[in-house]
Amino acid sequence: MDVLVINGPNLNLLGTRQPRFYGHKTLADINNDLLKIAKENNINIDFYQSNHEGQIIDKIQQTAAKIIIINPAAFTHTSVAIRDAFLAINKPFIEIHLSNIYNREEFRTKSFLSDIAYGCIFGFGPNGYTLALIEAINYINMKGE
């Protein structure tokens, strides 16, 4: 596998959950858009969503992906354990958020992942996933993997 896309808690509710912040696209819509781009670029992509921190950590530890795209959702601001999982596997990842976390409540402005991420994309709605995948493809091509 080339790219793993991980989505954290409550992202299974996209399309109906707070559309002011997150838009009207569902997670399935976003995944379908990414799958098309991946196929056009001969990239193998897999998708995973969980509301449970431990399951996300297990997925991070077990993946054979060359690069990970993650929207950790609320775990962004709370999970040292997810941070430690990324440090343990020593693989690049791109942190993504639909909304601009720096333009939200104060408690949402701290990310436990940003400083160790390959890159971060915030505030572009569902298009942020596309931007992240384009950069993941660039990374894979740059590494010649």
Swiss-Prot record:
Signal peptide: none annotated. It holds the Pfam family DHquinase_II. The active site is at 22 (proton acceptor), 97 (proton donor). CDD domains: DHQase_II. Substrate binds at residues 71, 77, 84, 98-99, 108. The record marks 17 as: Transition state stabilizer. One of its GO terms (biological process) is aromatic amino acid family biosynthetic process. It comes from Francisella tularensis subsp. mediasiatica (strain FSC147). It comes from the Bacteria. Catalyzes a trans-dehydration via an enolate intermediate. Pathway: Metabolic intermediate biosynthesis; chorismate biosynthesis; chorismate from D-erythrose 4-phosphate and phosphoenolpyruvate: step 3/7. This is 3-dehydroquinate dehydratase. SUPFAM superfamilies: Type II 3-dehydroquinate dehydratase. Disulfide bonds: none annotated. The keyword Amino-acid biosynthesis applies. GO terms for molecular function: 3-dehydroquinate dehydratase activity. HAMAP family: AroQ. Keywords: Amino-acid biosynthesis, Aromatic amino acid biosynthesis, Lyase. PANTHER family: CATABOLIC 3-DEHYDROQUINASE.
